[in-house]
């Protein structure tokens, strides 16, 4: 069982991506904690589109270039739900009335290197919230998937450097 399973055992929306990294778990964990938005290919472009080109205060949709992206997230709307070095990090946020999200990075040692997964889960408390979020998810999920895959690649570059 993962900490994500403990934090969000039920959900209606889910996205999962993985990558193999030739590094030890602690090095990968440190890379996850250190990656900045400018290291994630297309991050700034896709979040600019998501926010409609508006300038917003610093946050996950408007991350600066100097801080690790997880620090930006947890200093604004996200909170750490679990931090289990060097195995798993889970952060979560309240998106809107009746809608909560959690995401993790899970490091699983393998024969050579590690498998690193990131998963997002969203729970909507009632049918109205589910319908509202389903439309939003339909629109943002492709960009979200691109960001997650690029985020994993940025972690890999850092960990294998």
Predicted regions and their residues:
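Hydrophobic ligand-binding cavity/cleft-lining segments
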Residues: 1-70, 77
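Structured surface interface patches that mediate subunit assembly and partner/cofactor docking
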Residues: 6-11, 45-51, 55, 90, ...
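Intrinsic-disorder/low-complexity, polar/charged segments enriched in Ser/Thr/Lys/Arg/Asp/Glu/Gln
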Residues: 12-20, 88, 100-102, 113-117
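Hydrophobic pocket/interface hotspot
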Residues: 28-32, 80, 118, 155
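Short, intrinsically disordered, mixed-charge
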Residues: 33-37, 145, 157-160
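Hydrophobic-ligand binding "helix-grip"
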Residues: 69-112, 136, 149
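Beta-strand/loop substructures that line and gate deep hydrophobic ligand-binding cavities in soluble
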Residues: 98-144, 155
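Well-ordered alpha/beta subsegment
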Residues: 149-152, 156-157
């Amino acid at each position: 069982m993962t900490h994500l399973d403990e934090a969000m055992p039920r959900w209606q929306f889910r996205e999962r991506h993985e990558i193999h990294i030739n590094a030890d778990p602690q090095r990968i964990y440190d890379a996850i904690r250190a990656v900045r938005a400018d290291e994630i290919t297309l991050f700034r472009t896709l979040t600019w589109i998501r926010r409609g080109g508006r300038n917003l205060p610093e946050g996950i949709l408007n991350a600066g270039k100097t801080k690790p992206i997880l620090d930006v997230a947890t200093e604004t709307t996200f909170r750490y739900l679990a931090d289990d070095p060097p195995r798993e990090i889970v952060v979560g946020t309240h998106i809107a009335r009746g809608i909560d999200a959690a995401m993790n990075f899970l490091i699983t040692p393998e024969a050579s290197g590690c498998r690193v997964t990131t998963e997002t889960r969203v729970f909507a408390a009632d049918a109205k919230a589910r319908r509202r979020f389903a439309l939003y998810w339909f629109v943002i999920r492709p960009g979200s998937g691109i960001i997650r895959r690029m985020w994993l690649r940025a972690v890999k570059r850092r960990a294998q450097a």
